[in-house]
């Protein structure tokens, strides 16, 4: 596709039984969570997630950054769970962490998203000249 960047997958490793809001947002008393790029996924699993995320992006005519969440079973089959069209942009959020693993700095992520938004901006339909 033109200009689409597929970022590395992240696996959430936590001592909690669930990856819930408390775990995700951290803070005092929250279970520790670590985001790692899984090294042990079979190639077909990585390809299925990459291709699936790209197809979703195109099908929904997305712009900017999205996050597609998958769960992978013990056979390596990936199942799409949801599409997040407004992923978090705090430095410790999933999108900036995945960008960091891809060599994209936090500043590059933010300026890239802003530049794309400005380039694609159109006047609102209710604005008259």
Sequence positions of predicted segments:
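Generic hydrophobic alpha-helical scaffold/packing signal
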Residues: 10, 53-57, 110, 114
């Amino acid at each position: 596709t033109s200009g689409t960047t597929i970022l590395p997958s992240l696996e959430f490793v936590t001592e909690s039984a669930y990856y819930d809001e408390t775990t995700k947002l951290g803070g005092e008393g929250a279970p520790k969570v670590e985001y790692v790029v899984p090294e042990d996924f079979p190639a077909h699993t990585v390809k299925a997630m990459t291709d699936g995320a790209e197809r979703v992006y195109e099908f929904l005519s997305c712009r900017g950054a999205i996050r597609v969440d998958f769960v992978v079973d013990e056979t390596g089959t990936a199942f799409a769970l949801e599409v997040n069209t407004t992923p978090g942009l705090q430095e410790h959020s999933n999108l900036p962490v995945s960008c960091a693993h891809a060599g994209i700095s936090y500043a590059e992520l933010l300026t890239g998203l802003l530049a794309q938004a400005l380039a694609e901006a159109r006047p609102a339909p209710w604005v008259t000249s």
